[in-house]
Amino acid sequence: MYGYGYGGGCCSYGGYGYGGCGYGYGRTFALIVVLFILLIIVGAAYLGGGCC
């Protein structure tokens, strides 16, 4: 489920505007990026005691 794009069937897997075939990660890559950004935001808010 992670590295389909570089082999066959990359286009059929699809992606969120990452081009499926071009990057080869598709939804999994987008999901990891979103989770990573959320983790950074939550971590910064927790360690910094809030945004304000």
Swiss-Prot record:
Q: Does the keyword Acetylation apply?
A: no
Q: Transmembrane residues, as ranges? A: 29-49
Kindly list any coiled-coil regions of this protein.
Answer: none
Where does it mainly reside? membrane
Where is this protein found?
Answer: Membrane
Cellular-component GO terms for this entry: membrane
How does the UniProt record describe the way this protein sits in the membrane? Single-pass membrane protein
This protein's UniProt keywords: Membrane, Transmembrane, Transmembrane helix
**N-terminal signal peptide:** none
**Record carries keyword Membrane:** yes
Give the UniProt family note: Belongs to the SscA family.
Name of the protein in question: Uncharacterized membrane protein YkzV
Gene source species: Bacillus subtilis (strain 168)
